[in-house]
Amino acid sequence: RRPVASINFVTAHDGFTMRDLVSYNEKHNEANGEGNNDGESHNRSWNCGVEGDTDDEKVLVLRARQQRNFLATLLLSQGVPMVLHGDELGRTQQGNNNTYCQDSELSWIHWEAMDQPLIEFTAFVSKLRHDHPTFRRSRFFDGRPVRRGQGEKLPDIVWLKTDGTEMLPEDWGSGFGRTIGVFYNGDGIQEQD
């Protein structure tokens, strides 16, 4: 199978929106009238230190960065990215991860509350994906060295440590690493779309 067979997503219609994914540790489905028993309780979310809405600037900055991290990872991964409508706008459902029964303010798009910096970031990363074929290859990376012209042979993909050196097999098992870099070699593309 090829990369186009992979549908990649962070959030979907069943579950938290991306903003809620970084704003709530727990679901808040009380408005659904089922005693908060409906919807998945295992959300793999992190509220960045405060449950729900906050005015804490440090928390808001971290949440914005986490949303950008998710969008960049999604849009620059191989395969087909699926963005939940409204995630690029910063849409919230106030922690409700199961709005199937909500035809109300809770599930509607609030156009006046759009997160303009997030929209601009999403547009920038989308254009980057569009303009650079290495982010949407027709075949997976295989690590083979490639060379075009007289230049040095470089693998089609290289995983990097924080100091810029190539990761070794033992680095993958390190429990303390929090950062990873990747180099995509555009010369490694064999077939153009």
Predicted region positions:
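Short, contiguous acidic/charged loop-to-helix segments that flank catalytic cores in large enzymes
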Residues: 57-62, 112-116, 169-171
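Carbohydrate-binding surface patches
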Residues: 154-193
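Conserved alpha/beta catalytic core and glycan-binding cleft of carbohydrate-active enzymes
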Residues: 1-85, 98-102, 133-136, 140, ...
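Conserved hydrophobic/aromatic beta-strand scaffold that supports enzyme active sites
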Residues: 73, 108, 179-183
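Short helix/loop capping segments that flank catalytic or ligand/cofactor-binding pockets
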Residues: 18-21, 93, 191-192
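A structural signal for well-ordered alpha-helical segments within the folded catalytic domains
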Residues: 65-68, 116-123, 176-177
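Active-site-proximal helices and loops of the catalytic beta/alpha 8
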Residues: 1-3, 90-128, 132-135
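Short linear interaction motif-like sites in intrinsically disordered regions of transcription factors
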Residues: 47, 109-112, 160, 173
